[in-house]
Amino acid sequence: MFKYYHIEFWEFDDAHLCPPIPGRVDYIHHVNTLLKSSKIIDQIHVLDIGTGASCIYPILGQAEYQWNFVGTDIDKKSLECAQKIINKNNLSDAITLRHQQDSSQILKGILKEDDRFSVAICNPPFYKSEAEAIAATSRKLKGLNKDSKEVVRNFSGTQNELWYKGGEKAFIHNYLYESALFKTRCIWFTTLVSKKDLVKGMYASLKKLGATDIKTISMEQGHKISRIVAWTFQ
């Protein structure tokens, strides 16, 4: 962060998710390609859903492309950490934060009448519960031929960063529905999707909601394979 993106301050509590930078910046680059393909090249305004304490996507998007961001989160402490990072790096003119007061909502209560975003980005919670997160760690350890009597998560992250009632599927489908309610306030909506099996259902839902274009963008980092699904109503 300090060497390649010229960030002077990037600190947050160890309890919060520490994002791997290559995957995050890869998302930013793919979004840039998407915007250019739609001839959206000037005055880019990005909505970052679930900014988190690290404020990682706004920082990278500003460093790489000088985009302007609005970051949202349901956790006030995460927003306080993110705001400190913004202030210490003199980015308050480019990045602003909004608190989502209702954890069941994603865009509702956040978007304003005069908002006009070029794109929305989102890295949704993967798991339904902490138990599911621990089970994922257990499977990982077995794959590495490691045995542990007491299995704990092998990654950091607070509850709102890692799990959501109904898991990734429920979060994403809530996001799809709400995006249709605010179709004039954002040109492209996007999200990371970790489970490939969810994509078919997303396409079906988006077509019913009236999306005019839907794209799947493949992402690969080492052995990790993921994807971005992007859609627009315009």
Model-found features: residue ranges?
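Short proline/glycine-enriched turn/loop segments at secondary-structure junctions
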Residues: 216-222
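S-adenosylmethionine
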Residues: 74-76, 88-216
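Glycine-rich phosphate/diphosphate-binding loop of Rossmann-like nucleotide-binding domains
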Residues: 66-74
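Conserved SAM-binding loop
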Residues: 82-83
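Class I SAM-dependent transferase core
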Residues: 1-40
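Conserved class I S-adenosyl-L-methionine
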Residues: 41-52, 70
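Helix-rich interaction surfaces within compact, conserved domain-sized segments
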Residues: 223-233
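Conserved SAM-binding loop of SAM-dependent methyltransferases across substrates and taxa
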Residues: 53-67
